[in-house]
Amino acid sequence: QGETVHVGGYLGYEGEAAFAGLFGAYQKSDFNSMRQVTAANTRPLTAQADIDMTGRTFGGFAGYRAPVGGGLVLAPMVGATNIRIKRDGFDETGADPLNLQVSEETREVTYGTAQLRLSTLTPVAGGTFEPYLAGGVERYWGDLASVSDMRFAGAAGDMGSFRIIGAPLEETVGVLGAGFDVRPNDRFEIGASAGSRIGERTTQTTVEMHARIRF
């Protein structure tokens, strides 16, 4: 169980052909962790802990729309995003001597993306409807694997210390997506999209909706 507060912002430019944007977000989370632990010949114990996490994201992108005939528009796009997540250290209680002491962990990842987007713009009821397909590649740098240093609180000295290393992010993945944008007028836009990131070891699928107001 826990609570998360998330705030963010977006600033964009839309020209006749060129477009660009900057975005950022901040997140603060507070979780209550509970897990059952059992040692030989003992009854199950419940270990509890309060876990605090903060994170921030910022990035930008730019692209250019080029008509290719037949009402189709091809838009090459590039972008970069930096993500930093910090989890405070914490001590479990309630399961002595099997309580864990977990050290602070900070993870920072940067990724760049290059994509091609093919779309068509259709006038609808005084506005426009723009479906699109997109494909490209993403490249990741930084702390690709999470590393957590832990120890059993009941152990003497450095005894009982160990390290858990999570499965690393893939350095390069392919990106595929499809979606649509609806613009009733020049100031308002709503849309939805679905996308997949495909690598040698992992596949991730997302569905998103958005609304934008231009000033």
Give the ranges of each region predicted by the language model.
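Membrane translocator/pore-forming domains, dominated by Gram-negative outer-membrane beta-barrels
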Residues: 1-215
